[in-house]
């Protein structure tokens, strides 16, 4: 049974099902101003996908279940393995699919590619920030 004890009035509505790119006017303007306007359609598509309730839930799960160090198996044999929640892997796959790890280093890179990559990075950061560390190290 659920008891109604009070009315919550000081919290924003959940950010479910919004376009994280198109709802950020400053980011849209900066992308165009800094020479990556050619990527606006793809950024809008990425922003729509990342703004879904499902994507935001993946971010929550990745943070609720941090990586787990497995030093030994049940028989005492050394493992030295790290187990990640499936949400972490799905978020990493999205980062790679959106080329956040290598966009500016592609052979077909053009003016504004670093800006486009930074915008994609910012969109993913709104969902979950921990996955951005290995992607940044790969990009460096």
Task: Please describe what each predicted stretch is.
Residues 1-110:
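Extended, charge-enriched "interface" segments that sit outside catalytic cores
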